[in-house]
A protein has these predicted regions:
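Extracellular/surface-exposed low-complexity repeats and stalk/linker segments enriched in Gly/Pro
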Residues: 2-44, 61-71
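Short beta-strand segments and strand-loop junctions that repeat across beta-rich extracellular domains
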Residues: 45-58
Length: 71
């Protein structure tokens, strides 16, 4: 077995309400959104990851349990 050295960096996530995550006009969906962007859903206490860069790109809970499509 071989081990690879890695450098862990601090993950800086923005805290956003569930209402804003679901709103395609909210800044979290219209400003600097990209595939792989992480945000903290402060309403439901869960980490979300964007699937794409558009304002209607799906947000997935990182455990894969559910997704939110902004509308």
């Amino acid at each position: 077995m071989s081990l690879t050295q890695v450098s862990w960096q601090f993950i800086n996530t923005v805290s956003v309400t569930a209402t804003d995550i679901a709103d395609k006009t909210a800044p979290v969906n219209t400003t600097n959104k990209y595939a792989g962007l992480f945000v903290w859903d402060s309403t439901n206490h869960r980490l979300m990851r964007s699937e794409g860069a558009t304002n209607v790109s799906v947000w997935w809970v990182v455990d894969g349990s559910t997704s939110i499509t902004p509308s």
